């Protein structure tokens, strides 16, 4: 199926492979992990908090469906869902967002998935710029976005906390897929509470 994007068309659904991951549309087998991703307090700490009970019930009961720009991150070796990634136009601009379950953070999966998805976007979409928004206190995410070539466009307040709106050109080169973006200066991954 071909879908119309803000600036053109792209085939959908699409599966994107990286060395360790498959970025794919969600399926019914992902429901439990998706609910956990939406309700886990560690995962949601910088994402506006865990969803409420009514939203959780709606997710449990609704068909997952295939929506343009929304994928799950699954391990290539066994298809275990470890997180999600989106590239959509909810704010009127192409926006990247990602979340991992706590036990999968700090292992390079966020960087790997972002590089793979941004590489796909540069080939398939006509957009020139992609944005990302991160809480200023989410130092790991801000550090990753900077390493991916994002720069701060502006600060803003959202969900009662300070955020950064970052942007990068889709036409600029991406870091090598094999390169590790993790450095000793990076904050440690979150721990289970």
Provide a role label for each language-model segment:
Residues 1-103, 115-120, 124-135, 148-193:
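GNAT-family acyltransferases
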Residues 109-111:
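Glycine-rich acyl-CoA binding loop
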Residues 145:
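Conserved active-site tyrosine of GNAT-family acetyltransferases
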């Amino acid at each position: 199926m071909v879908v119309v994007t803000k600036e053109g068309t792209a085939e959908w659904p699409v599966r994107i492979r990286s060395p360790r991951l498959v970025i794919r549309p969600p399926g019914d087998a992902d429901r439990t992990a998706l609910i956990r991703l939406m309700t886990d307090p560690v995962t949601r700490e910088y994402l506006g908090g865990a969803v409420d009970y009514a939203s959780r019930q709606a997710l449990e009961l609704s068909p997952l469906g295939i929506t343009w720009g929304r994928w799950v991150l699954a391990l290539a070796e066994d298809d275990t869902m470890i997180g999600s990634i989106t590239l959509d136009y909810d704010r009127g601009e192409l926006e990247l967002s990602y979340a991992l379950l706590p036990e999968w953070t700090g292992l390079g999966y966020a960087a790997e998935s972002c590089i793979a998805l941004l590489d796909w976007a540069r080939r398939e979409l006509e957009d020139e710029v992609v944005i990302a928004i991160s809480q200023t206190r989410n130092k790991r995410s801000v550090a990753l976005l900077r390493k991916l070539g994002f720069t701060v466009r502006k600060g803003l307040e959202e969900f009662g906390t300070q955020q950064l709106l970052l942007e990068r050109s889709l036409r600029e080169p991406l870091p090598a897929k094999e390169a590790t973006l993790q450095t000793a200066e990076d904050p440690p991954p979150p721990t289970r509470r």
